[in-house]
């Protein structure tokens, strides 16, 4: 999967990051979108997102990745955060079992606010800290399989599987969209979710319409 031109895209996919504070969501976001990692552990406040345009086959896909940015500490994430999302990475810290123990609650909250067809990946982050592991790989994988989720272990610190995690989610979304396009006379320039539907494309951009998974 390669980088496309930021100003030219065929699809916009909103993907949300969810999970407990301190599991590494912000660093996964910055590693994927900017190839950066911050050792500063201070929690960021306020919802923010970053984008990266990638190529899936011949299609340019603009991934709009949203980060809770600390709001999960106060249980203050609103339905607006989930609105229009077609993908989600549910992240836990594999060195802190308590962050894994609440994964089911996060999944329920996600399904309460997002479309049932949303593509979800369970992500065990901080795989570089293998000596401090508290969550067995097989336990998390089994939970993912039983709940119809994708699963990967990642390290935002050393980049392990970060690209693969986002790439896999985006490909799954793209496969669903492509299947719908085959059965639809609509334009092939499609944005998913109400948040993107109202955006006006800039110079060189392809106008997008809206489709639900």
Swiss-Prot record:
In what tissue types does this protein appear?
Expression is restricted to epithelial cells. Expressed in the gastrointestinal mucosa, (highest expression seen in the ileum and colon), kidney, and lung. A very minor and variable level of expression is seen in the splenic tissue.
Q: Which residues form a coiled coil?
A: none
**What is its subcellular localisation?**
Cell membrane; Cell projection, Pseudopodium membrane; Cytoplasmic vesicle
Q: What is its main location?
A: membrane
Which residues are annotated with the lipid modification S-geranylgeranyl cysteine? 209-210
Catalyses which reaction(s):
GTP + H2O = GDP + phosphate + H(+)
Record's keyword annotation contains Lipoprotein? yes
Superkingdom in the source lineage = Eukaryota
* EC code(s) of this entry: 3.6.5.2
A GO biological-process term? protein transport
Residue ranges of the motif Switch 2: 67-84
Recorded topology in the membrane: Lipid-anchor
Sites where the protein binds GTP: 21, 24-27, 38-39, 43-44, 70, 125-126, 128, 156-157
Please name the InterPro entries in this protein's record: P-loop_NTPase, Rab_GTPases_membrane_traffic, Small_GTP-bd, Small_GTPase
Chain residues in the propeptide: 211-213
Q: Among the entry's GO cellular component annotations, what is one? A: pseudopodium membrane
What Pfam families does this protein map onto?
Ras
Cofactor(s) needed, names only, are:
Mg(2+)
Activity regulation, in the record's words, is: Regulated by guanine nucleotide exchange factors (GEFs) which promote the exchange of bound GDP for free GTP. Regulated by GTPase activating proteins (GAPs) which increase the GTP hydrolysis activity. Inhibited by GDP dissociation inhibitors (GDIs) which prevent Rab-GDP dissociation.
According to the UniProt entry, the note on domains is: Switch 1, switch 2 and the interswitch regions are characteristic of Rab GTPases and mediate the interactions with Rab downstream effectors. The switch regions undergo conformational changes upon nucleotide binding which drive interaction with specific sets of effector proteins, with most effectors only binding to GTP-bound Rab.
Alphabetized PANTHER family for the sequence:
DRAB11-RELATED
Could you describe the subunit structure of this protein? Interacts (GTP-bound form) with RAB11FIP1, RAB11FIP2, RAB11FIP3 and RAB11FIP4. Interacts (via the hypervariable C-terminal region) with ITGB1 (via the cytoplasmic region); the interaction is GTP-dependent. Interacts with ITGAV. Associates with the integrin alpha-V/beta-1 heterodimer. Interacts with VPS33B.
Family under the similarity heading: Belongs to the small GTPase superfamily. Rab family.
Protein known as = Ras-related protein Rab-25
Instruction: Give the encoding gene's name.
Output: RAB25
């Amino acid at each position: 999967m390669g980088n496309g031109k930021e100003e030219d895209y065929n699809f916009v996919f909103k993907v949300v990051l969810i999970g407990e504070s301190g599991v590494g969501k912000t660093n996964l976001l910055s590693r994927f979108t900017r190839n950066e990692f911050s050792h500063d552990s201070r929690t960021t406040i306020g919802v923010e997102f970053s984008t990266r345009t990638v190529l899936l086959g011949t299609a340019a896909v603009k991934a709009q990745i949203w980060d809770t940015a600390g709001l999960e500490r106060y249980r203050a994430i609103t339905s607006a955060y989930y609105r229009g999302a077609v993908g989600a990475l549910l992240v836990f810290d594999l060195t802190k079992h308590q962050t894994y123990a609440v994964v089911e609650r996060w999944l329920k909250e996600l399904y309460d606010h997002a479309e049932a067809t949303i593509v979800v990946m369970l992500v065990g982050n901080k795989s570089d800290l293998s000596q401090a592991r508290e969550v067995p790989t097989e336990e998390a994988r089994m939970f993912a399989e039983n709940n119809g989720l994708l699963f990967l272990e990642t390290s935002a610190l050393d980049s392990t599987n970060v690209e693969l995690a986002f790439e896999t989610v985006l490909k799954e979304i793209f496969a669903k969209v492509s299947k719908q396009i085959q059965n639809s006379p609509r334009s092939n320039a499609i944005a998913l979710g109400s948040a993107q539907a109202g955006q006006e494309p800039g110079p060189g951009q392809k106008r997008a319409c809206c489709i639900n998974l």
